[in-house]
């Protein structure tokens, strides 16, 4: 559906050349929600603006719907862009016209017939649950409502791809969740492919199927959201995953606890998150776990949780208990045993 092949972007400044993208390649499958996450300056905004050639790449190929956009004429590119919708952090609504006209005007300029415009405006305002505000002006809307209008406007061209450039970063947490729910609904009901960029792990875990992590203009890790959450490899990826779990254990406390036992992180995914495996292990083996922190969050279609525990007992019994937990589908990290990577506490 979307494929970037060795895409680079170099900006020329007074101080010299700045390489915003470094030979980046990735694929987005038809119908999926693909997220790109990274800190400020990682290159994610440049990347997403290259997808519809708002930024022309210095090198590489951008293939959307089996068309290499970098080879198209101006007229051909304009036509191809009609199948690529885009929403932004800043909404970009016309302040002097109504909600209805904000959606209808671009369709009019594109030569869509009047009756079809009326049909589409109503259809997509109903999808974003704002048809009753069609005669309102942007100044009369909340931030979340403005973003819903922007989404309806993008959808009114009936694109096959929707690009989201930090579309929720200016919104409060509750409104962010409502916009994410709307994007997920659109993806599932309309089947539109969504490529989004964000610096918030909450966005990734709520609606994405797959994710790429960017740093210094390059993709440093990618995979399914489940893979990234349960087995992050790069230190930056680990920081993003840990940001989804608020609890932090002070270094002094860790040091003191490690004198009398092992500090272990247990990660649960899907069905295993509901199993009383820890309780069973406590009864079956001579171990005494003390829960230091815990959190359960929801990925797109399944639960994911973490428990940080202080496990006391004879080493042999602790080893057996941790092996048992692994057999139950629980990911075991940390401690003095060789059960996985060193756990990070934030």
UniProtKB/Swiss-Prot annotation:
Broadest EC class assigned to this enzyme: translocase
Enzyme Commission number(s) from the entry: 7.4.2.11
Localization in the cell: Cell membrane
Assembly: The complex is composed of two ATP-binding proteins (MetN), two transmembrane proteins (MetI) and a solute-binding protein (MetQ).
Name listed for the protein in its UniProt record: Methionine import ATP-binding protein MetN 1
Reaction(s) catalysed (UniProt annotation): L-methionine(out) + ATP + H2O = L-methionine(in) + ADP + phosphate + H(+); D-methionine(out) + ATP + H2O = D-methionine(in) + ADP + phosphate + H(+)
Protein source organism: Bacillus cereus (strain ZK / E33L)
Role noted for this protein: Part of the ABC transporter complex MetNIQ involved in methionine import. Responsible for energy coupling to the transport system.
GO cellular component, one term: plasma membrane
Positions that bind ATP: 38-45
CDD domains recorded: ABC_MetN_methionine_transporter (cd03258)
GO MF terms held by the record: ABC-type D-methionine transporter activity; ATP binding; ATP hydrolysis activity
UniProt family annotation: Belongs to the ABC transporter superfamily. Methionine importer (TC 3.A.1.24) family.
Main subcellular localisation: membrane
Domain ABC transporter positions: 2-241
Keywords: Amino-acid transport, ATP-binding, Cell membrane, Membrane, Nucleotide-binding, Translocase, Transport
Topology versus the membrane: Peripheral membrane protein
Top-level division of the source organism's lineage: Bacteria
């Amino acid at each position: 559906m979307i494929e970037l092949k060795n895409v680079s972007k170099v900006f020329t400044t007074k101080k010299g050349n700045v390489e915003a993208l470094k030979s980046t390649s990735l694929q987005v499958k038809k119908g999926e929600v693909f997220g790109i996450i990274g800190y400020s300056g990682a290159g994610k905004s440049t990347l997403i603006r290259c997808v519809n050639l708002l930024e022309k790449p210095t090198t590489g190929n951008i293939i959307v719907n089996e068309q290499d956009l970098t080879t198209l004429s101006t007229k051909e590119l304009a036509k191809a862009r009609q199948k690529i919708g885009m929403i932004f952090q800043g909404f970009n609504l016309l302040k002097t016209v109504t909600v209805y006209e904000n959606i209808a005007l671009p369709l009019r300029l594109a030569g869509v017939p009047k009756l079809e415009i009326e049909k589409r405006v109503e259809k997509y305002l109903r999808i974003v649950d704002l048809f009753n505000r069609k005669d309102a002006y942007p100044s009369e809307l909340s931030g979340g409502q403005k973003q819903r209008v922007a989404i309806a406007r993008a959808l009114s061209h009936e694109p096959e791809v929707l690009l989201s450039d930090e579309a929720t970063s200016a919104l409060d947490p509750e409104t962010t969740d409502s916009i994410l729910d709307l994007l997920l609904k659109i993806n599932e009901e309309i089947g539109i492919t969504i490529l989004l960029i964000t610096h918030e792990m909450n966005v990734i875990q709520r609606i994405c199927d797959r994710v790429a992590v960017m740093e210094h203009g390059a993709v440093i890790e990618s995979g399914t959201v489940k893979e990234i959450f349960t087995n992050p490899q790069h230190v930056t990826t680990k920081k993003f995953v840990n940001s989804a779990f608020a609890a932090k254990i002070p270094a002094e406390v860790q040091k003191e606890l490690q004198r009398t036992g092992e500090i272990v992180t247990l990660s649960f995914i899907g069905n295993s998150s509901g199993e009383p495996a820890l309780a069973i292990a406590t009864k079956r083996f001579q171990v005494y776990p003390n829960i230091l922190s815990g959190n359960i969050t929801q990925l797109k279609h399944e639960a994911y949780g973490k428990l940080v525990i202080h496990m006391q007992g004879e080493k042999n019994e602790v080893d057996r208990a941790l092996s048992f937990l692994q057999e139950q589908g629980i990911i075991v990290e940390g401690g003095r045993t060789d059960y996985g990577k060193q756990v990070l506490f934030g």
